[in-house]
């Protein structure tokens, strides 16, 4: 049987402190360390050293240091680690093309060059496995939906897909006569939950670059980027529900959500590298990335089912009857929207010693409170110019709460290369990326926005800092070169199945899920084949 509460009791309930739901959008703003094996092997700390194709997408001035044209292609496997999944079991190793590009070097003066480049890179690899399980104490997913409604927090644009599914399948809002029960709110507590998530896909970055130098002292570069998003996420979530005594398990409720996001984005990057001392190889680099202006579409199919019967009590006769709530309900959603990612600013230094040792250090900063979810307005046709136009506006409530959930992130990259012989090189690198999420942030399902209204899941993870270590080898003979790199990356986080709810009147109505420690661990092997001419 369900817990039944009158509206009068719930009228005085108050939701906990508000926070923002930008967790889905934030995935699109993350960037991975990827590129040529030389670049990855040195931890990506080449924004001042330059002379590598991968710097097209980081510091556009980098290709300006090249004195020979070159082409390169990079590929290799990536392994994601995670607990074994029983429902969404699949491959943990993927193999693909990570980089392909080239730079054409043209001499325009005695000491000046004008170079043109193109580079394809997987700037973001979404592949990830996540598994979490925990016990509940007077808590459940359907309970949080009930508390949300009867606390007066349920509005037109925050009545989510998840709320709708639980409403029809579990809450018993449809009586024997097919009418909506408005006098009572009903819910089940759960003994615990288990969840499995599988994320797949990537963001392809197509970068077009022009770079050059002035008297071999100052190097300038400009890159135009086109990004193509392919993201797929499958979530399985199950709860073991309890009867009214909170002692006996009566059955399970299962949610299966399949979500896909696709679209394109544009960005611009500017960079400069300078040698402040004429006879020294010491270099200083600086660069800036505009936001990526995305237009995206997300579609999802969400299914909720239960494996037990629900019985109601007739208020007139006191007899129980089998409720006519469906045991299963499916919901399809689709949403087009725009997303602007934060600006990126970077500084770098690099130095070489006797053409044997190369050292690089890079610092980047990006303020994720500037992540901007935008609502698309209606298209219109301008008959004067003969063109279609599309306007959008910032989701004001989403934007306000983004500042409460996200924060500025600092990235530090260090790398070195040693030429053991003129043909053979050894490389190593390290990255530290500070957290983008505040530890106090949570996915607020009470915000009146499209993001809440079309939410098909409620879970979130506050990811902490990222640490990467890299190693690499290089071999060159004549104009041909080949490189290999290994990278290990780890990001720990706190997983929550849904937001916290606290009732100021009756603590038994609280919904307080505990954090579950999760970790995103990745290993990658990368190989590059290239030719200079």
Regions found by a protein language model. Give the residues of each.
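Bacterial Sec-dependent N-terminal signal peptides
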Residues: 1-23, 529, 533
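Transmembrane beta-strand segments of Gram-negative outer membrane beta-barrel proteins
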Residues: 21-46, 63-81
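A common structural microfeature
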Residues: 39, 53-55, 68-74, 97-99, ...
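N-terminal periplasmic accessory domains that precede
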Residues: 56-62
């Amino acid at each position: 049987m369900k817990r039944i509460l009158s509206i009068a009791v719930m009228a005085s309930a108050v939701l906990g402190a508000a926070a923002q739901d930008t967790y889905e959008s934030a995935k699109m703003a993350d960037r991975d360390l990827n590129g040529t094996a030389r670049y990855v092997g040195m931890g990506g700390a080449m924004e001042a050293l330059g002379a590598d194709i991968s710097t097209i997408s980081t510091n556009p001035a980098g290709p300006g240091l090249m004195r020979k044209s070159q082409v390169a292609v990079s590929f290799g496997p990536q392994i994601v680690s995670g607990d074994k999944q029983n429902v969404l079991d699949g491959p943990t190793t993927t193999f693909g093309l990570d980089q392909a590009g080239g730079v054409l070097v043209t001499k325009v003066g005695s000491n000046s060059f004008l170079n043109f480049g193109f580079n394809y890179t997987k700037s973001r690899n979404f592949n990830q496995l996540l598994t979490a399980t925990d016990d509940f104490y007077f808590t459940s997913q359907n309970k949080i939906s009930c508390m949300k409604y009867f606390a007066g927090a349920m509005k037109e644009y925050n009545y989510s897909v998840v709320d709708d599914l639980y409403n029809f399948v579990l809450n018993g809002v449809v009586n024997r006569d097919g009418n909506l029960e408005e006098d009572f709110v009903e819910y089940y507590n759960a003994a615990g939950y288990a969840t499995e998530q599988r994320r797949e896909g990537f963001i392809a970055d197509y970068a077009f670059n022009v770079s050059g130098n002035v008297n071999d002292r100052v190097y300038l570069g400009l890159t135009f980027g086109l990004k193509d998003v392919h993201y797929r996420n499958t979530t399985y979530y199950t709860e073991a529900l309890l009867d009214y005594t909170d002692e006996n398990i009566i059955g399970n409720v299962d949610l299966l959500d399949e979500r896909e996001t696709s679209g394109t984005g544009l960005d611009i990057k500017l960079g400069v590298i300078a040698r402040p001392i004429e006879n020294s190889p010491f270099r200083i680099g600086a660069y800036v990335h505009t936001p990526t202006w995305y237009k995206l579409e997300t579609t999802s199919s969400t299914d909720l089912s239960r494996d037990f019967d629900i019985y109601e009590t007739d208020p007139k006769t006191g007899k129980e009857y089998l409720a006519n709530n469906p045991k299963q309900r499916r919901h399809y959603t689709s949403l087009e929207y725009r997303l602007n990612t934060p600006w990126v600013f970077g500084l770098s230094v690099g130095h070489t010693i006797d053409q044997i040792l190369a050292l690089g250090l890079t610092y980047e900063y990006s303020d994720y409170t500037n992540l901007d979810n935008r609502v698309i307005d209606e298209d219109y046709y301008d008959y004067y110019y003969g063109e279609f136009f599309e306007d959008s506006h910032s989701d004001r409530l989403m934007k306000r709460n983004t500042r409460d959930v996200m924060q500025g992130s600092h990235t530090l990259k260090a790398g070195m290369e040693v030429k053991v012989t003129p043909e053979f090189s050894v490389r190593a690198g390290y990255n530290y990326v500070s957290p983008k999420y505040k530890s106090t942030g949570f996915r607020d399902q009470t915000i009146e926005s499209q993001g809440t209204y079309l939410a098909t899941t409620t879970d979130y993870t506050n990811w902490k800092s990222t640490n990467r270590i890299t190693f690499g080898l290089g071999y060159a003979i004549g104009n041909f070169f080949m490189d290999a790199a290994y990278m290990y990356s780890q990001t720990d986080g706190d997983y929550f199945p849904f937001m916290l709810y606290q009732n100021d009147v009756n603590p038994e109505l609280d919904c307080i899920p505990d954090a579950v420690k999760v970790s995103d661990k990745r290993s990658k092997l990368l190989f590059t084949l290239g030719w200079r001419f």
